[in-house]
Amino acid sequence: GLAVVLWQIAQLSPVQQPLLFAALAVAISFLSASQDIVFDAWRTDVLPSDERGLGSSLMVASYRAAMVMSGGVAFIWAEQWQSWAKVYQTMAWLMLAAAVLTVLVAERYERAPGQKLAAPGRELLAFVLMLVGVAAAVWLARAVLILFGLDPNDANKWIQLLFLLSEIALALPTALWLARRFGFDTLNRSLDSFFTREGAWSVLALIVLYKLGDAFAGSLTTPFLLRELQFTSAEVGIVNKIMGLGASIFGALVGGLMMVRIGLYRALLWFGVLQLVSNFGFLLLAWYGRGTLGSFELPPFDIVIASLDHRATVDWALASVVFVEQLAAGMGTAAFLALLTALSHSQFSATQFALLSALGSVGRVYVSPVSGVLAPAIGWPAFFAFTALMALPGLLMLHAMRARIVQIERQ
């Protein structure tokens, strides 16, 4: 499906056929998201417990490598060929090759029979009604706040945060009620399966809290480096694209290999502590500023993911902090995905992994408004100290749930 849509969009002009082009772009987003869910479900089903860590690390490393392909190589091809149509056609052929390779080499997996779900038509109707209900709930929450004289476009970030939290508070229970009311069995039974387990709410809290400190720090890292410390865009881009991306891939692979030896609980604990410590690097940058450790020069280069047509000076402190932070993030993400894999029941692996990973992204998505308010209010050094403190609740909960995590790993 992705190959076909990519091929079709290559034949269109966004200027002459904007509506059809936009529709195909939406289709690409829908199909790619569906592909992610199916792949995660397949990986969850086929990997035995002792291979979840390494499998998750390989997935993280491959995902980052694919980002290089789509975000770096594609632009190089576009410049060389002077044609985005050829780039999309090439991507279509690559997707077709991946589909053929999947058919040829992917392990067949026969899922154990489970409970019969509702008819697909009824499920689709329930899903559509749930989306409509969520949209209506968001509109209603905004309307109520507007009636009280608040403006959703107000420059005050506290007011923007109030709108966001109000919309979530009304939309989430509305979605769950509609799913129950209209028989969205895939979602309902997935939730029932999860919440009948021992300590389900504690596990959900751990999922939200584990990456929270990392999410707080990452949400404002780039504005901090560019606006506060006055690093150049080229310097930050070079460090992030080369050292940061390389460190995250390396960290994911190292984390996977370590999980084979130390197990899931200790991996989550050790990598979580490393993520906490890495936030102090930005605290030191905020205290001492640029130039503390000196700098080094990069000669001109042209590689797959980046190019530089002149010599550039790179700050050693910046490079070191970003390398350590991305290394820790890669290791922590690999362990975190291994936990989500272990938590997903084989009968509902697609739905449960998608829901759990979405829950794990709550911090990353919704802390940005809070961070945007907090950093100017308390200052950058205090903000990064706060991000480190926000990593502690997840680690403390992880320690308290040690026996439960070990039990989950062995399932």
Where in the sequence are the language-model features?
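A late C-terminal transmembrane helix in Major Facilitator Superfamily
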Residues: 245, 343-377
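Intracellular juxtamembrane helix-capping segments at the cytosolic ends
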Residues: 33-47, 331-345
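C-terminal transmembrane helical hairpin of 12-TM major facilitator-type secondary transporters
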Residues: 266-336
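Small-residue (Gly/Pro/Ala) motifs that create kinks and tight helix-helix packing interfaces
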Residues: 69-78, 222, 255, 367-375
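Short amphipathic helix-loop junctions that connect adjacent transmembrane helices
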Residues: 149-154, 210, 219-237
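Intracellular loop-helix junctions on the cytosolic face of multi-pass helical membrane proteins
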Residues: 10-20, 49-209, 398-411
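Helix-to-loop junctions at the C-terminal end of transmembrane segments
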Residues: 78, 250-270, 285, 290, ...
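Loop-to-transmembrane helix entry/capping segments in MFS-fold secondary transporters
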Residues: 49-58, 233-235, 346-356
